[in-house]
Curated annotation (Swiss-Prot):
It comes from Dehalococcoides mccartyi (strain ATCC BAA-2266 / KCTC 15142 / 195). InterPro entries: aa-tRNA-synth_II (IPR006195), aa-tRNA-synth_II/BPL/LPL (IPR045864), Phe-tRNA-synth_IIc_asu (IPR004529), Phe-tRNA_ligase_II_N (IPR004188), Phe_tRNA_ligase_alpha1_bac (IPR022911), Phenylalanyl-tRNA_Synthase (IPR002319), tRNA-bd_arm (IPR010978). This is Phenylalanine--tRNA ligase alpha subunit. Keywords: Aminoacyl-tRNA synthetase, ATP-binding, Cytoplasm, Ligase, Magnesium, Metal-binding, Nucleotide-binding, Protein biosynthesis. It comes from the Bacteria. NCBIfam families: pheS. The lineage of its organism: Bacteria, Bacillati, Chloroflexota, Dehalococcoidia, Dehalococcoidales.
Length: 346
């Protein structure tokens, strides 16, 4: 029968071509030519409808057998070609070579300093706490003996949240210091107290080499019987010795803070040696790192602690200034610049 003969010839030709193929792209072209919708095999079957029934059945069976044989041969050839291609690629791969390492991040210098500072105070008997960054007026100001007419309440220094209370007053803000956590802790705990509170604080200040609107602060509080300025000075001197080294100069001088009385400012000698062109100390040779003092009796009384029986001291330091002094960094904004050339140095 002529149709069966054509099918046999197409099959033999297809298998011969398949045997000679060496590239996967040629294999796909072969599939389209012999197994596609418009393949040679399909074309050979177009005249089957005009044949007698018996011949039509025989030709159809031959076509199905041919198609099955070609499909099986195609799949086998495809698998062998892929394995050969993979083997040729593997020959150029030295599996004994070490892989390319993934880039590993580093702990941010401010996080490193925060961990170091809290570790130092932990060895001095302090507990480490955290507090909310969104505060209310009472804990951020009133409870810390900051009256309503104090300049710190002005919008120029405080980020108020536009959510008035029942009286129409703005009562919610981004904390300007970590001191509110002192009040919250004393409201629920009685002396003896010895805590430090690290965290972000926010002040509406002009940005320059030593000031930014968001920075990191660590607040400390000690309340117990018989606490004096000697305890305050001894604690802070020991901290400076451990952090900066024994040869660094530390200066205490009087200052005013509403929630302590008396108050002191603590400064550390600048690495520039007092050069006039220094953008950090502006030629003074000193950089203030913290404010401190004896806790004001009114602050203790507000939280129900007897100020006649207990005394205490508090301090708050800007953490960005510590690595600036240690490493001679001349601009506080570098810590928040996301410049990997700077961050990789720590």
């Amino acid at each position: 029968m002529e149709e069966i003969k054509n099918i046999t010839e197409i099959t033999q030709s297809a298998l011969a071509e398949l045997e000679a193929i060496t590239e996967l792209k040629d294999l796909e072209a072969w599939r389209v030519r012999y197994l596609g919708k418009k393949s040679l095999l399909t074309g050979a079957l177009r005249n089957l409808a005009s044949l007698p029934i018996e011949e039509r059945k025989a030709a159809g069976a031959a076509a199905n057998e041919a198609k099955a044989a070609l499909e099986a041969a195609f799949l086998e050839k495809e698998q062998l070609s892929k394995e050969k291609q993979f083997a040729s690629r593997s020959e150029g791969l030295d599996i004994t070579l070490p892989g390319r390492p993934w880039p590993i991040g580093r702990i941010h210098p401010l996080t490193q300093v925060t961990n170091e500072v809290t570790a130092i105070f932990s060895t001095l008997g302090f507990s480490v706490l955290e507090g909310p960054e969104i505060e209310d007026d009472y804990h951020n100001f009133e409870a810390l003996n900051i009256p309503e007419d104090h300049p710190a309440r002005e919008n120029m220094q405080t980020f108020w949240i536009d959510r008035p209370n029942e009286d129409g007053r703005l009562d919610t803000l981004l904390r300007t210091h970590t001191s509110p956590m002192q009040v919250r802790y004393m409201e629920k705990n009685k002396p003896p107290i010895r805590i430090v509170v690290p965290g972000k604080v926010y002040r509406y200040e002009a940005t320059d080499a030593t000031h930014i609107p968001m920075f990191t602060q660590v607040e400390g509080l000690v309340v117990d019987e018989g606490i004096s300025m000697a305890h305050l000075k001894g604690t802070l001197m020991e901290f400076c010795r451990r952090f900066f080294g024994a040869n660094r100069k530390v200066r205490f001088r009087c200052d005013y803070f509403p929630f302590v009385e008396p108050g002191v400012e603590v400064a550390v000698s600048c690495t520039c040696g007092g050069k006039k062109e220094c953008s950090v100390c502006h030629g003074s040779g000193w950089l203030e790192i913290l404010g401190a003092g004896m806790v004001h009796p009114r602050v203790l009384e507000r939280v129900g602690i007897d100020s006649e029986k207990y005394t205490g001291f508090a301090f708050g330091m800007g953490l960005e200034r510590l690595p600036m002094l240690r490493y001679g960094i001349d601009d506080i904004r570098l810590f928040y610049s996301n410049d990997t050339r700077f961050l990789r140095q720590f």
